[in-house]
């Protein structure tokens, strides 16, 4: 096998069980396979949805890497030293696979890389620049702050749970604690909840929630 070595409990993150070069063609092929799978699952390339997880670590045979898509922006997060060093190759592969639909790549790994590696990584754009994309999930619109927000800016992996809440929300009172972007709140409102309370201790998060509400056409 071949993979990324790193000091710690996980010594090697395996990229391939066959002796193949980890070159530009490798990254393009892995990302292409992941993208085609998302289209098959109707997570990508469909109306009323421009937000999805393109790369989910081991699930896409790229352990240590997470890439979330928000409209025309890819937010890349490395959880291993090897992925950090490959970030520019990965960025070029993203551009090759996604083409003109990709306008920005933001690298956000300062808080996810092992501190013992002492890499001095800084968050920033690898491609494109300052932009504010509106994330659309199942027709609902959200303001995503991938620079200052938690994780990559939005909890993309909670899509099914948000939809489930919408199904059960009709005529109910809903309390959304630690609401962050208000994802669950908006789904509950669209589902017919009588009242929805969104609570978060962070003033920044509360402001983001308010901006999402003002994005209009949410309901």
Where are the regions that the model predicts?
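Non-catalytic accessory regions of SAM-dependent methyltransferases
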Residues: 1-71
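Cysteine-centered catalytic environments shared across enzyme families
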Residues: 23-49, 76-119
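Conserved alpha-helix/loop element of class I SAM-dependent methyltransferases that forms part
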Residues: 157-169
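Single conserved hydrophobic/aromatic residue that forms the stacking wall/gate
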Residues: 212, 216-219
């Amino acid at each position: 096998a071949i993979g990324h070595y790193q000091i710690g409990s996980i010594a090697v993150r395996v990229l391939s069980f066959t002796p193949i070069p980890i070159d530009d063609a490798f990254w393009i092929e892995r990302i292409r396979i992941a993208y085609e799978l998302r289209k098959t699952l109707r997570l990508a390339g469909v109306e009323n949805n421009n937000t999805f997880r393109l790369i989910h670590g081991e699930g896409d045979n790229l352990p240590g890497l997470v890439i979330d898509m928000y409209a025309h922006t890819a937010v890349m997060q490395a959880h291993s030293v090897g992925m950090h060093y490959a970030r520019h190759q990965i960025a070029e592969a993203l551009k090759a696979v996604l083409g003109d639909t990709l306008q920005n790549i933001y690298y956000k790994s300062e808080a996810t890389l092992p501190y013992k590696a002492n890499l001095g990584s800084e968050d920033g754009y690898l491609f494109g620049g300052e932009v504010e994309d509106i994330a659309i999930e199942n027709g609902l619109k959200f303001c995503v702050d991938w620079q200052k927000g938690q994780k990559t800016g939005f909890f993309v992996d909670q899509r099914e749970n948000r939809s489930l809440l919408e199904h059960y929300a009709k005529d109910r009172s809903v309390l959304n604690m630690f609401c962050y972007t208000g994802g669950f709140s908006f789904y509950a409102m669209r589902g017919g909840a009588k009242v929805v309370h969104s609570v978060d201790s962070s003033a920044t998060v509360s402001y983001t929630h308010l901006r999402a509400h003002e994005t209009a056409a949410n309901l």
